[in-house]
């Protein structure tokens, strides 16, 4: 069985919701899925005043466990077109894994959330891809076989780089991931799990 890690950071719950959909899609493809979050860096009192969602059920990940999975799907909100500092801090600790080639050949993928339609979804995903490539991972996106990313009848996230959602309703209020955005997240989870399973099976045949 293929092992998939959905590793995310979420301030207000939007990426957490997308992570659950990604995990569902990976399970539908037959993968064994773990959902983990990275540690929060914001002091608890500050996070509480800012309204952060602090009751997230996913266990906190450790850097060392990344090597245990065949695929890692990363979810992060955008911060000025880049990943959140919480995710960057976590990934910056993978130097030991990098030095030992522990993540080389594993599948990596990224999804995100932004506050606005043009808030840096693609640059956030692509800049995170850079880290995955340095770690030697095989980067997988959200192919156009997911037709939902081509919709023109509604404002929606999603691009060939990865699933995404918009967190602001345009009037400063909260917007939750739409049905189409969640469909994209599930599709990405299935797609990554299927590719990882094919790679694992191929390597087992070569080793036999």
Curated annotation (Swiss-Prot):
Residues the entry annotates as binding substrate: 98
Region (Disordered): 161-183
Keyword NADP included in the entry's annotation: yes
Catalytic activities: a quinone + NADH + H(+) = a quinol + NAD(+); a quinone + NADPH + H(+) = a quinol + NADP(+)
Keywords attached to this entry: Flavoprotein, FMN, NAD, NADP, Nucleotide-binding, Oxidoreductase, Plasmid
Cofactor, free-text remark: Binds 1 FMN per monomer.
Flavodoxin-like domain residues: 4-192
Lineage top rank: taxon: Bacteria
Name the UniProt record assigns to this protein: NAD(P)H dehydrogenase (quinone)
Originating organism: Paracoccus denitrificans (strain Pd 1222)
